[in-house]
Amino acid sequence: MKLHELKPAEGSRKVRNRVGRGTSSGNGKTSGRGQKGQKARSGGGVRLGFEGGQTPLFRRMPKRGFSNINAKEYALVNLDQLNVFEDGTEVTPVVLKEAGIVRAEKSGVKILGNGELTKKLSVKAAKFSKSAEAAITAKGGSIEVI
């Protein structure tokens, strides 16, 4: 085998279909757009969700609920994520952000009880679940709501 004998694998390089280049190509004349009509024109076509003038599905369905502008969204942290810290560390939202455990503090940090805590930590957060509170104090750590 020589360099000039190298060829790409069968079917690995598909030839681009050039439309509107003669009838024998199979996509000449109307370029695969059929005859006249909205979809045959340049820039033609209907918008997303258009159903031909019939009331579209999204307008037939009733509206429901609302978004509470006063809702608080907490950054959630589970107990097993706190095991990255050394024994006796004071864990605050700023420390959690620096460690890359939370991206943004949002309305504060809430500690949840999923997983197992193996270290004695002093944790400061906006909220604690009951199971997280129990697990932290059981390991001899302390909690503080800020």
Curated annotation (Swiss-Prot):
Residues 1-59 are annotated as: Disordered. Belongs to the universal ribosomal protein uL15 family. InterPro entries: Ribosomal_uL15, Ribosomal_uL15/eL18, Ribosomal_uL15/eL18_sf, Ribosomal_uL15_bac-type, Ribosomal_uL15_CS. Residues 1-13 have a biased composition (Basic and acidic residues). Residues 23-35, 42-52 have a biased composition (Gly residues). Keywords: Ribonucleoprotein, Ribosomal protein, RNA-binding, rRNA-binding. NCBIfam families: rplO_bact. The keyword Ion transport does not apply. Pfam families: Ribosomal_L27A (PF00828). This is Large ribosomal subunit protein uL15. GO terms for molecular function: rRNA binding; structural constituent of ribosome. Part of the 50S ribosomal subunit.
